[in-house]
Amino acid sequence: GYEAKYGDKMSSVLDITYKKPERLEGSASVSLLGASAYVGIATKKLTWTNGIRYKTNQYLLGTLDTKGEYDPRYIDYQTYLNWTPSKRWEVGVIGNISENRYNFQPEDRYTRFGTLSNVREFKVYFEGQEKDLFRTLFGTAYATYRLNEQNSLTLQASAFHTKEQETYDITGQYWLNSLDSGTQVDGTTNEEETSETIGVGTYMEHARNYLTAEVQSYSITGRHRLKSHSLQWGAEFKRERIKDRMREWEMRDSAGYSMPQTSEGPELFYTLRSRNETDSKRYGFYLQDTYRFRSTAGLFTLTAGIRGSYWDWNKEFIFSPRASLALIPAFNEK
């Protein structure tokens, strides 16, 4: 596992240190798949970074077997503002807005499969469209107070909101054919002709899926240095609200017969209806100590700590002791 300060993460951790520009700077790039730009501003007490990206893989999706009008678009904006009014205080704001839209109007699909002696051809003609939306908003504000060079306290508040919707109504009419391989008069090239129609049919797919989630978090953390020890602690309160609604169904009609067939009449091949809502609170704390010492072998770092968390949704309390030992060999310290 990982250090106690990293929460309940046991398989992966993303620990980011944000860049602080030292002067006015910027960059930009443009390609067939999108564009990006960055601007950094710096004064004696303030730094501000801004970045924006736009991407589209419309040209890549055009090479798929299913032909149609693909219109995928992704855009996001990130900002980081840091203000240091004095040697003791540091205030920062981090924000992120991202939106991913996927619009698709399928037209037809043409696929061949099988072996050299048994070739199949699958054709589908579509009507309808799909519209998907994924939007995320994230913001964090923090204030750090340094009592001295060895002790500091940080208050932090953050909020996260996401909205996802998947909607489509698509009808497809398909033909499955068997192909015969023949030889031209000169005997140099093989040509394929449709010899038999194995199956025809129609299917309809419908979906109205919506998901919204909100997470609010408030925390206080502290850091204290005592000679070779670095003591860190923290407490956190988090509220999570999730709303999920799914409506999906699929109808299949093979050669004029609705599938599946029952004695009570035609039924849908697949259907899904669900509605879920959760409103829960999480409480957590951690305490850990990092001790560094040298020997002839190199620099050792011993980290040990405890973490506790409680989730009122399942009334479960988790207590997690953690420890790790790292070594930088002496020949690597140079």
Regions flagged by a language model, labelled:
Residues G1-E25:
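N-terminal periplasmic accessory domains that precede
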Residues A213-V215, R273-K334:
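Structural signature of Gram-negative outer-membrane beta-barrels, strongest in the C-terminal barrel
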Residues A35-I41, T79-W83, G139-Y145, Y218-H224, ...:
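Residues on the lipid-exposed face of transmembrane beta-strands in outer-membrane beta-barrel proteins
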Residues G26-A28, W48-N50, V91-V93, L153-A157, ...:
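Transmembrane beta-strands of outer-membrane beta-barrel proteins
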Residues S27, S31-Y54, K67-P106, E130-H161:
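Transmembrane beta-barrel wall of Gram-negative outer-membrane proteins
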Residues P21, L33, T43-L46, T84-R88, ...:
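Outer-membrane beta-barrel channels and translocator barrels
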Residues Y18, L32-G34, T43-K45, Y54-Q58, ...:
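Transmembrane beta-strands of outer-membrane beta-barrel pores
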